[in-house]
């Protein structure tokens, strides 16, 4: 199974790249974790936000292809670490690759939300999208460590 993080935004601070890459390199070869960045639409005073969201959504769904789609969204289901490990196991058994979608400043398009098989809430707080990349990578790595009895996660 391959994991994909499909995220709106291309110019992240160095600390985001450093944090994300740290967890990316730890993933096992049989579970590669790939980042696909979708350019954010131009937002200005008179921007048509609906059109921008729709275009970003189309690009995200095209990147995801036929993968299982999991959106990251505040109203999604909150999973603690053991629950995420169980989800990871279910995804592996399903046999499809998984695309996790992170929207832009206005969130995800209606098409992305409709295409999602699952919606995951990291927190009831609104988190900065660059930070979410690092949190998702660490959380999935920790979940993997539980499923393989790797010593990274401690109770």
Curated annotation (Swiss-Prot):
Any GO molecular function: rRNA (pseudouridine-N3-)-methyltransferase activity
Alphabetically ordered keywords of this record: Cytoplasm, Methyltransferase, rRNA processing, S-adenosyl-L-methionine, Transferase
Pfam families per the UniProt record, alphabetical: SPOUT_MTase
Domain of life: Bacteria
Record's function text: Specifically methylates the pseudouridine at position 1915 (m3Psi1915) in 23S rRNA.
Family indicated by similarity: Belongs to the RNA methyltransferase RlmH family.
Name listed for the protein in its UniProt record: Ribosomal RNA large subunit methyltransferase H
Taxon lineage: Bacteria, Pseudomonadati, Pseudomonadota, Gammaproteobacteria, Enterobacterales
